[in-house]
Amino acid sequence: MVVRDNQIAAERISPRPRRRRLLKSPRLRIHRDKHGRTLEIAAALRAATLITPYPNCVTSPDVSSSFPELHNTIVVAAFEGWNDAGDAASDALEHLDAIWEADPIVEIDDEAYYDYQVNRPVIRQVDGVTRELVWPSMRISYCRPPGADRDIVLMHGVEPNMRWRTFCAELLAVADKLNVDTVVILGALLADTPHTRPVPVSGAAYSPESAERFGLQETRYEGPTGIAGVFQDACVASGIPAVTFWAAVPHYVSQPPSPKATVALLRRVEEVLDIEVPLADLPAQAEEWELAVTEMTTDDDEIAEYVQSLEQRGDAEVDMTEVLGKIDGDALAAEFERYLRRRRPGFGR
């Protein structure tokens, strides 16, 4: 009996055997945990059906013939959750999907990425009779907008709870099959910005030249990041240019929707794609949203005073930017040289 108990105990504490068969990929690195067990990577888990297709769509990202043939492709991506204040970014992706009638390609909904106690599946009524269970996922679709000379891939889904590097590798594997050469990531954050002014849009670019092209100021932020920042880093590391746009949503009205921020992000998409993005009734929704928030804030003297202080601070920053923008750099340098000459010993004697 003692021997049997000891055998059971030994089996319980014995380390699991290591995986020995791994698919190699020049793009992916293999990570191991502290016990030496190999962590899952996208290339090693293809056979585990990490990607679940839409009906009548692609069955495996490894089968090139099952993907649509796209060229000069650009990705527009957004992630729900921490990266999506007021649902501004995800609403922008849903708008693009609707107006351009995007065709679905694949859906990544593997439970290796999601904690269902944090991001729970949702039950929806269908025709008032049957019910549909919707799992947290990442949906990937494509389209060719009218007047565009390139294909657009839309990536929209829920920020994963775990295995972010594997998740990004999965998205990059799909991007590689679709001949993606540029990635645009949309996000939204809560900020000290008034709802009565244009929505500030900041961002992160892959090079100083791209930052200048898209009018992005150099960011000095250091701190936690979400899957949007991780995915951008993964894209750049794999050789795909990627830029992220962040719309600032007033923190005192953080509940979705935030149509004004959504419009601001779509304007940025227009700049990158160099085509007009139909906004439908979004501008009208943005006006109604601003009026409703104004009415709400004016009912509370303390909040109204706070909003006014944000307006004054923002206007002062804009005025200073305009002043600095009018300064002639060459004239300023010449004046500085004259100042230095005046400071030299013996000047004017």
Feature names for model-found ranges:
Residues 150, 157-208, 231:
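Internal, conserved structured core segments that host functional sites
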Residues 11, 19-36:
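Polybasic, low-complexity intrinsically disordered segments
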Residues 9-10, 38, 42-52:
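Ala/Thr-enriched low-complexity intrinsically disordered regions
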Residues 53-157:
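N-terminal short beta-loop-beta anion/metal-coordinating cradle
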Residues 192-272, 276:
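Catalytic cores of processing enzymes, dominated by hydrolases/peptidases
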Residues 79-83, 154-164, 214-222, 252-256:
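Flexible, glycine/proline-enriched loop segments at strand-loop-helix junctions
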Residues 253-349:
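A conserved C-terminal secondary-structure "cap"
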Residues 3-5, 31-32:
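Intrinsic low-complexity, disordered N-terminal segments enriched in polar/charged/small residues
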